[in-house]
């Protein structure tokens, strides 16, 4: 494969992954949660650690709570994510009645690990930045900013999220709840 073909393959893969993320954001914004769940592998790990304020130089080992060891905002699999969706869909979920108005913005999508040749990859590691805007009732507004580190797996002709680590850029949660998905 020539350098030009390799570069074109990389661009096509980048565009394909960006389109996947834009589609995922649209599903969440439109409350099409069952379709969103279909974008997740059955063995997904969905993890959002607590963030700590730490001294410079110790952020690598101490800034985030440890997966499977410490408390976390989310440490879930497909079953618990499906239960959360089912609860929202009952119409009696107190934190989502009335429903929130939500927009997901995804940017700075970077494929951080892909096999050479890229476009035929079965799994990819991808980082992205997000901004989630939420408005509830008349005057409750929340803005969440952070980074997602995903493992995407190519399954049945399309991409699915096999692992998602969400780093929220807040050490203290400023919102009343986390009833939506990142």
What is the role of each PLM region?
Residues 105, 133-135, 148:
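Charged, gly/pro-rich active-site loop segments
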Residues 42-126:
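A solvent-exposed, acidic/Ser-Thr-rich amphipathic alpha-helical stretch
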Residues 1, 118-127, 144-177:
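Short beta-strand edge/turn micro-motifs at domain boundaries
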Residues 40, 130-132, 165:
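Short beta-strand segments enriched in hydrophobic/aromatic residues
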Residues 132-142, 172:
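Short, cysteine-centered beta-strand-loop-beta hairpins and adjacent loop/turn segments enriched
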């Amino acid at each position: 494969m020539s350098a030009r073909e390799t570069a074109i393959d990389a661009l096509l893969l980048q565009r394909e992954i960006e389109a996947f993320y834009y589609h995922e954001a649209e599903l969440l914004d439109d409350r099409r949660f069952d379709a969103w769940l279909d974008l997740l592998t059955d063995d997904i790990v969905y993890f959002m650690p607590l963030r700590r304020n730490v001294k410079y130089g110790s952020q690598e080992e101490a800034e985030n709570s440890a997966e499977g060891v410490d408390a976390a905002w989310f440490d879930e699999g497909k079953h618990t994510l499906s239960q959360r969706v089912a609860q929202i869909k009952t119409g009696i979920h107190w934190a989502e009645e009335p429903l929130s108005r939500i927009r997901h913005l995804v940017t700075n999508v970077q494929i951080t690990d892909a096999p050479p040749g890229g476009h035929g990859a079965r799994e990819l590691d991808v980082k992205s930045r997000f901004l989630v805007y939420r408005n509830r009732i008349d005057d409750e507004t929340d803005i969440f900013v952070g980074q997602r580190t995903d493992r995407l797996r190519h399954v049945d002709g399309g991409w699915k999220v096999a692992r998602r680590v969400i780093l929220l850029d807040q050490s203290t949660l400023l919102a009343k709840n986390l009833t939506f998905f990142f």
